């Protein structure tokens, strides 16, 4: 699983769930400030990623994730090679 594949999955999920244009979502996009996402949206995204990739995202790490890039970096670094 490449970082780009993780990014595309996160971008597509957010575009669908938050009804925003996928083209507006980049690494520096902030969940609250740019996407008007609340904490529930972020929790739902993280649970989706945990379930999809078979990883755990500790609460203390999740609390630091303010941008799309931060989530993508964490997931990409912790996904086993053959995860899809």
How should each PLM-predicted stretch be described?
Residues 1-41, 47, 51-84:
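Phosphopantetheine-dependent thiolation modules in NRPS/PKS and related acyl-activating systems
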């Amino acid at each position: 699983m490449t970082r780009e594949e993780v990014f595309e999955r996160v971008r597509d999920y957010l575009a669908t769930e938050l009804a925003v244009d996928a083209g507006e979502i980049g690494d520096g996009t902030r969940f609250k400030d740019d996407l008007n996402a609340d904490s529930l949206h972020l929790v739902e995204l993280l649970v989706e990623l945990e379930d999809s990739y078979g990883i755990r995202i500790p609460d203390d790490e999740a609390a630091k994730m303010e941008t799309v890039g931060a989530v993508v970096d964490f997931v990409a670094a912790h996904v086993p090679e053959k995860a899809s």
